[in-house]
Amino acid sequence: MANHSSAKKAARQTVKRTLINKKRSSAIKTFIKKVVHEISLGNKENANIALSVAQSKIMQGVKKNIIKLNTASRKISRLSRQIKSLKVNNTL
């Protein structure tokens, strides 16, 4: 347990930051799962839309130091490569 008031404050801030970072990390994972779901359905148009939203959230995570830049780039690259390999769904 912290004895100094500054150490107590630092401990409180750590708890607060940890909750915020977990929330942001969970949101990023959720958006990635949405893209993967659209890819599994084979819906290229919706997958592209979901990827653009996920890409935005992933890069926001990089800016907030939730994930590293290379990790984000790798995730985006792999998702976009999977979408690119899909055939265009011509059903109307």
Swiss-Prot record:
Keywords: Ribonucleoprotein, Ribosomal protein, RNA-binding, rRNA-binding
GO molecular function, one term: small ribosomal subunit rRNA binding
Gene3D superfamilies assigned: Ribosomal protein S20
GO terms under biological process: translation
GO cellular component assignments: small ribosomal subunit
Alphabetical list of Pfam families matching this protein: Ribosomal_S20p (PF01649)
Cross-referenced InterPro entries: Ribosomal_bS20, Ribosomal_bS20_sf
Protein family membership: Belongs to the bacterial ribosomal protein bS20 family.
Function noted in UniProt: Binds directly to 16S ribosomal RNA.
HAMAP family: Ribosomal_bS20 (MF_00500)
Protein name: Small ribosomal subunit protein bS20
Underlying gene: rpsT
